[in-house]
């Protein structure tokens, strides 16, 4: 490696390694645990595309999309392995690479980007210790611009490089469109309070679950009980009444906001129902909602639902 390239790699390494110092929770992933190194862990960068079996899930892609200032389709033109001693924090079985890529398309973002750029990424070695062959491969990068360093990008998480395919790009574009639409649901940050109020008839009543949001706007879940019928519930991301009986469909942004960011248990003191039985019913309704939402599955190691 030339002395000039040594200096470039050293400078860029300092920028890219800043990713490790930023917990993923600060990038909008509740309960997330950052990976041990750039590009490490299941689904490591460049090992699979966004539609392969066992690959990134809806939640993974939504996490990356919300963290990224730029989503870029690029073709890798050059890979230079960084010596391990110049790659602090490198996980075992990984290698750090100085990548040169040619821009194919700017899928999302407003920051200017040139015809080519450089970035750092960690990639898994195979069983024989061989490096992956990604030259001329198209990839999707979830990144941010580096202030004062035109021509450099910084991946937003360790797994923010993924192999490109037409299906993968279409999936990313669909999720981005939902996240960026004018009526996209606000980010949920927790549970403010919940209460069950019984009705006039035995078995009749309603649980209201009021949610905290990032921008302080209204959001709530309503669970309605009628005698002889299964509980019905819905969510409202505004001051309007919840659409009872029409809960969010899986793999929608509404579902993502709830399934991936509601805690497993409401925080202590948030259940404000008047009596013991009412508090038990409110807690049971909360568990029912979580059960119907199902698991927020992630394969990129970026977090899970938190404990209350």
Where in the sequence are the language-model features?
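Transition segments tied to proteolytic processing and entry into folded domains
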Residues: 2, 25-308
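N-terminal signal peptide c-region/cleavage motif recognized by signal peptidases
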Residues: 21-23
């Amino acid at each position: 490696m030339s002395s000039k390239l040594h200096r470039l790699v050293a400078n860029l390494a300092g920028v890219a390694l800043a990713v490790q110092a930023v917990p993923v929770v600060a990038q909008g992933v509740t309960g997330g645990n950052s990976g041990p190194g750039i590009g490490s862990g299941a689904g490591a960068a460049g090992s699979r595309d966004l539609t392969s079996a066992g690959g990134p899930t809806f939640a993974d892609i939504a996490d990356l999309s919300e963290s990224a200032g730029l989503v870029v389709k690029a073709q890798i033109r050059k890979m230079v392995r960084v010596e391990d001693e110049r790659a602090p924090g490198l996980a075992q079985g990984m290698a750090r690479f100085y990548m040169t890529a040619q821009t194919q398309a700017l899928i999302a973002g407003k920051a200017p980007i040139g015809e080519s750029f450089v970035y750092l990424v960690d990639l898994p070695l195979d069983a024989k210790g061989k490096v992956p062959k990604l030259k001329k491969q198209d990839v999707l990068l979830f990144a941010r611009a580096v202030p004062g360093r035109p021509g450099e990008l910084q991946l937003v998480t360790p797994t923010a490089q993924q192999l490109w395919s037409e299906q993968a790009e279409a999936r990313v574009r669909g999720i981005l469109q939902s996240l960026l639409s004018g009526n996209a649901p606000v980010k949920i940050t927790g549970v403010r309070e919940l209460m069950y109020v019984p009705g006039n008839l035995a078995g009749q009543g309603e649980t209201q679950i009021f949610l905290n949001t990032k921008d302080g706007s209204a959001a709530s879940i309503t669970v309605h009980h009628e005698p002889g019928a299964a509980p019905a519930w819905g969510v409202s991301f505004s001051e309007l009444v919840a659409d009872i009986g029409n809960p969010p469909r899986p793999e929608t942004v509404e579902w993502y906001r709830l399934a991936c960011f509601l805690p497993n248990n409401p925080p202590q003191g948030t259940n404000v129902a008047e009596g013991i039985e009412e508090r038990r019913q409110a807690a049971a309704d909360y568990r029912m909602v979580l059960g119907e939402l199902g698991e927020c599955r992630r394969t990129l190691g970026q977090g899970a639902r938190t404990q209350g």
